[in-house]
Amino acid sequence: DVLVFGMPQKFHYGDGMGTNPIMMMQALSAQVLRFKRVMSDNCVIICSSICNGYFHDELWPYLREQYELFQHDHMNTLPDMNRLGEYFATNEEYIRKYRYTNAFHPFHGFSMMSCGHIAEMNTSAIYIVGAEEPGYARGMGLKTRATFEEALEDAKKKYVGQEPNILALPMTFKKAAVHLCMKDPAQDCMDEYGHRHPCCC
């Protein structure tokens, strides 16, 4: 019912992965993809992040602009940003930074947003705890609380009831990722490639 883990500032794609709000969503969604087999239908994620507004503009020079655009102009969910993909992918300054300064390609942000939407589709709520600049998390549709305890109490009241099953993953993003499955294959609604079995629909 509840997944609990922390998100360091630097992992996977680089420094800022756990503080840049779009990259945070990608990381949260990656966890959903890894644990979907064991998550309940009303699952909640509680994740710690300093969420301090560090975008690492040198590595992802386009993500601050993408984040700002997501806050306006009828952008209600991440897929609403799709119409801007070609604009970013052909932005000459962002392409120059990709070619000459080791930045990611500007279309990479759309890949991250596409993945990032998976977390919203497959959870009842996602809480970020301990954020220094919580508005960045709220700007991505995440809930914010000061502590794990506050987040868990809110989740119990609103989503998972008073005795939820809690999976705590303290080494998340620090060691190799695991993909969890049900012990009984008949209860596992996905095969080893993530395809849903007909009996689970």
Regions found by a protein language model. Give the residues of each.
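Accessory "access/gating" subregions that flank catalytic or transport cores
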Residues: 1-23
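Structural motif
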Residues: 2-6, 45-46, 167-168
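Structural signal for hydrophobic packing residues in well-ordered secondary-structure cores
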Residues: 4-7, 11, 39, 43, ...
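Flexible loop/turn segments at secondary-structure boundaries
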Residues: 10-14, 53-58, 134-137, 174-177
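Acidic/glycine-enriched edge-of-secondary-structure segments
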Residues: 12-19, 97-102, 129-142
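Composition- and surface-driven signal marking solvent-exposed, interaction-prone regions
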Residues: 16-19, 58-63, 140-144, 180-182
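C-terminal catalytic subdomain
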Residues: 22-127
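Extended hydrophobic packing segments that form well-structured cores
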Residues: 114-201
